[in-house]
Amino acid sequence: MAKENPPVVFGPVLSRRFGKSLGVDLSPSKKQCNYNCIYCELGKAKPIERMEEVIKVETLINAIQNALNNLTTPIDVLTITANGEPTLYPHLLELIQSIKPFLKGIKTLILSNGSLFYEPKVQQALKEFDIVKFSLDAIDLKAFERVDKPYSKDINKILEGISCFSQIYQGQLVAEVLLIKGVNDSANNLKLIAAFLKQINIARVDLSTIDRPSSFKAPKLSEDELLKCSLFFEGLCVSLPKRSITQAKKLVSCGIDELLALISRRPLSAEEAPLILDPNAFKHLETLLNHKQITIKKVGSLEFYCAF
């Protein structure tokens, strides 16, 4: 039997920081990224300069329209992401301009590693989004190479691109700094990141650590250690959110194949599962475990359902 193409739209899922989110995957078939971050939950892959497999814009638009038409609960944001880096998608501007007219008040969000913000074509597309969130895990070159394992190691060019974009962007610009114990949590690296972010037009810094199974062995920081790291960012709006289980709702009603596809993209917390899955979808977890299509992994004190 021929293998079906993976869906390009997934969710809704509960985002820790942006509410109820419907996700759009610009690279559903495989990971395509110019980084190979040690904390990536998508697995290891050789970083690339450009996308090798490009999905048609029309396919994405139709999938998004269909998903929105079939929603049973309101969402807060439409999140553009990828199995990799979404700004590698060559038709990003056409896509965002095509879908915005029928979103009816739903905010648009893109999750990027920030590495291509210096490109005019990328800047033009990003300006169309309500929220742009980029990662900045290191400025210290040694830490940058260790944590992000990039295709291009020109950190100065990346920083110049982020700074330039921040001057022309009118939406909400959010930085995420993900810290790994003993890798990029040094005082020197934190000082460099904080100093840079204080120079640009940024709405918030989301400071976090490992909370899901990752590609490489990547030790997480404790809550106390993360709190101490946040002190380097004095003067900035820093968010240190905890997973809010009480806010979760039963958002997902899906078949077993859809649930497997969802878990393949995003490991599901065992604590959240009964709260965001309806009873029928929740029962599918046991079936997937019994058939060895998913497994349970432990990260710190948390357990996650993960695809093999």
Show where each model-derived region lies.
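Structural motif
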Residues: 19-21, 37, 75, 131, ...
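Canonical Radical SAM [4Fe-4S] cluster-binding loop centered on the CxxxCxxC motif
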Residues: 16-59
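Generic beta-structure capping elements
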Residues: 27-29, 42-43, 137, 178, ...
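Auxiliary Fe-S-binding modules of radical SAM enzymes
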Residues: 2-17, 28, 62, 71, ...
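Glycine-rich beta-strand-to-loop/alpha-helix junction loops that act as flexible
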Residues: 79-85, 113
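Conserved alpha-helical substructure of the radical SAM core
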Residues: 43-79, 90-94
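Conserved AdoMet/S-adenosylmethionine-binding subsite of the radical SAM
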Residues: 88-225
